[in-house]
Amino acid sequence: MPIGSYSSFRDIIRQVLMHNPKTVLDLGIGHGINGAGIRNWLNVGIKENYKQTTLIGVEGFRQYHSPLWDCYDLVEITTIQDYLDNSNAQYDCILMTDVLEHFDKDEGNAIINKIVNTKLAPGGILLVSTPAVWIEQGAAYGNELETHRSLWHFTDFIGMPGVEIIKDGREDDMGYMMLVVKITKV
């Protein structure tokens, strides 16, 4: 879906604010709510402050375009895999919110490893959120990229260097069961 979990949004934005990144890559932006949150809270909603943070979005489905995309300095219309293969940039913060479940486990782990090893700047953070329960979903809105292919558990991340489990998948105060993980490049 072109939207993520409301209950994870507050955790993601909190981590972004605590890290205060100068460069942010948002992978799988959907309608662009993460960009709006970053501009609203990190840049205090003031257009002149936008230059303090470079915000790049990647989205594989052009039809998700919304006015929130204007919060980004640039939105690349391509798959996450192609972007990671063809970009040499490094970022202080990379977001994968409600994206990981769209890859099988092997591909998801390969993407995480590529991000941490080649796309995160030293001391940078990767923030991942994904449902902690299986939700059957096919090609929503005619978008094959929306198909759910995997279920992740916090134990899938244990042992990775720099991992901090922010939300472990247990039901939260809103009734959601989400996993939120921060990986810091050491």
Give the positions of each predicted feature:
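Short catalytic micro-motifs in class I SAM-dependent methyltransferases
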Residues: 98-102
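Conserved N-terminal segment of class I S-adenosyl-L-methionine
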Residues: 1-89, 93, 106-113, 118, ...
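Residues that cap or initiate secondary-structure elements
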Residues: 134, 185-186
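A short acidic, helix-capping loop that chelates divalent metal ions and anchors anionic groups
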Residues: 136-140
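Short beta-alpha junction loops
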Residues: 61-62, 131-134
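Conserved beta-strand signature within the Rossmann-like core of class I S-adenosyl-L-methionine
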Residues: 123-131
